[in-house]
Amino acid sequence: MPTYNQLVRFGRKSKTRKTKSPALESNPFKSGVCLVVKTVTPKKPNSALRKIATVRLSNKRTVNAYIPGEKHSVKEHDRVLVRGGQVPDLPGVKYHIVLGAYDIAGVKGRKQGRSRYGTPRKQVAVTKK
C-alpha cells in the first residue's frame, strides 16, 4: 500500500496490455508477399497437416500465417492480405491469410460462411415471362 506522499510524487501506473498480433502494428490488415508455403503438424492431441505460409509484410516483418479452408491457391511470390487471429493448435502462428483478396482465390463450392472463405455468391438464373 503506497503512502499518500508516494501517490502524490509518482501516481498510479496503468497496466499496458500486450497485443496478440504485434506485426500488424495496430492495423486490422497488412499486405505482404508469400515467401514459402508449407504444411505443419499440430500439437497433441490433434493430428493433421495444416497449411501455413511464411509472409514478408509491407513493414518488412516476416510472419507465419495460416491458410484457412479446403484447398488453396497460395503460391510463392503471391501478394496476400494478412489479418490477426491465432491458430490454437499451431504454436507461433498468430495470423491468418484473407482468402479472396489480391492474388488469392476463395474456396470453391462453399455454400455457408462464404464471407470467411472469399467465395462469391452463386448467380441465380432469372427467367423472363
Curated annotation (Swiss-Prot):
Region (Disordered) residue spans: 1-25, 109-129
Compositionally skewed regions (Basic residues) per UniProt: 10-20
Family: Belongs to the universal ribosomal protein uS12 family.
Keywords: Methylation, Ribonucleoprotein, Ribosomal protein, RNA-binding, rRNA-binding, tRNA-binding
CDD domains with a match to the protein in the record: Ribosomal_S12 (cd03368)
Organism in which the protein naturally occurs: Rickettsia peacockii (strain Rustic)
CC per GO annotation: small ribosomal subunit
GO terms of molecular function: rRNA binding; structural constituent of ribosome; tRNA binding
InterPro entries associated with the record: NA-bd_OB-fold, Ribosomal_uS12, Ribosomal_uS12_bac
Subunit composition and interactions: Part of the 30S ribosomal subunit. Contacts proteins S8 and S17. May interact with IF1 in the 30S initiation complex.
Annotated GO biological process: translation
Name by which UniProt lists this protein: Small ribosomal subunit protein uS12
Short name of one Pfam family: Ribosom_S12_S23
